[in-house]
Amino acid sequence: MRSETDVVVIGAGMGGLAAAIGAAAAGLRVTVVEAGDAPGGKARAVPTPGGPADTGPTVLTMRHVLDALFAACGTRAEEHLTLIPLPRLARHFWPDGSSLDLFTDTEANIEAIRAFAGDKEAAAFRRFDHLTTGLWEAFHRSVIAAPKPDLWRIAAATVTRPQLWPALRPGLTMRDLLAHHFKDPRLAQLFGRYATYVGGRPGATPAVLSLIWQAEVQGVWAIREGMHGVAAALARVAEAKGVRFHYGAKAKRIVRKEGRVTAVEIETGVSIPCGACIFNGDPGALRDGLLGDAARASMEKSPRPAPSLSAWVWAFGATPIGVDLAHHNVFFTADPELEFGPIGAGEMPEEPTLYICAQDREMQAPVPEIERFEIIMNGPAGHQPFPQEEAQCRARTFPMLAAMGLTFSPDPETRALTTPALLSRRFPGSLGAIYGGSPEGTLATFRRPLARTGLKGLYLAGGGTHPGAGVPMALTSGTHAARALLADRISAAK
């Protein structure tokens, strides 16, 4: 392994890749150690008869974040990936046989909702869209893009916008806000679904996070190479900038000497001297002492949050039979409480809502006979398997889809299923949560760990770190970590 290294990045997830690129672009010598056999972290794929199927994130928004990383390496995303803009955000289905497509175009959405639920609900959507636009404008620069949530900037951005104040009331949830806007429960259910995009339940997630709608409506892209292909492309351009990657290299300990990071030890016994370390993993791994006492002590002032949602994920190849699928699809339960009630109690949902990514649809290419699918059923975090887990999950997934007109041939095999317990083992310290800490609670956004820790030279990146979950957020966290590291080096040199 590299003996002359300025920075060791632990983990080649999206946050780690962005951090490595940011540090290397500034001229630092960077080594990435990754326990797995490929980059991507949660953005991974499994082999199927139809080709590699994503079994992690599938939605790419805020594309400017990705573009900036390729630009830092002197290239363009289009030279490495086939990025396809999707005019249709998703196709939504309900048990009563109704369905609704939503788009990136506001007027198209208004007309679709008018045909779906009538003039009053179309007008309600226009008001909701206007409100969330204002929330996005107020919170994007002051929270999402900022290295630390800036209360003064939030106040300055909202004090002159009284129309936003009701959505900022402490204790008001997304479910409350949406019930005020929409009389049709299907629309309240649909837009409440965005709470799950950051790992929360709509009945407990702050109303302000309704702004997530704007992250999608501003643009969604499909990637022909898959989300795992995005990670592979970022790793390639990072290597071209001089970053060295070591796969199958599990970090064992972050070494402290004289109050700062001096090395990272690998389980094989190799020690990599360095001046700084960026940890791209769940912060819970540090709190649990999995990287040594020095790393654990660095998190003493950062209390462990409640975990976000986990999921049961099917990834497989098959031929679909029945309803016409888009790239992104949501099959809703008739009663959201039969989903979120059990999840809140730590149980598998009785009647889940199911997200399906039909990875070969809307890709500007013929749809193959064997298509690739990812099906996500939200669930509670936890490291222990559920009783009869595979059978229970199968029974609550495919009969529901069949009742709504969708079947697959052949049925997915057991090995196609990823469980919360498996996610917990794969991502130490996470308890199987796939969105970091829970977004539920008024102050959850302000309690996420920031890039700097209590140990000089140790920084954090990833979905468990500010600004939170999702591919663009994880990438942003990596950029924050690299910038914090560089700023500290400049300060120390003065």
From Swiss-Prot:
One of its GO terms (molecular function) is oxidoreductase activity, acting on the CH-CH group of donors. One of its GO terms (biological process) is chlorophyll biosynthetic process. InterPro entries: Amino_oxidase (IPR002937), carotdesatCrtD (IPR054841), Carotenoid/retinoid_OxRdtase (IPR014105), FAD/NAD-bd_sf (IPR036188), Phytoene_DH_bac_CS (IPR008150). Gene3D superfamilies: FAD/NAD(P)-binding domain. It holds the Pfam family Amino_oxidase. Its EC number is 1.3.99.27. Belongs to the carotenoid/retinoid oxidoreductase family. PANTHER family: 4,4'-DIAPONEUROSPORENE OXYGENASE, PHYTOENE DESATURASE. This is Hydroxyneurosporene desaturase.
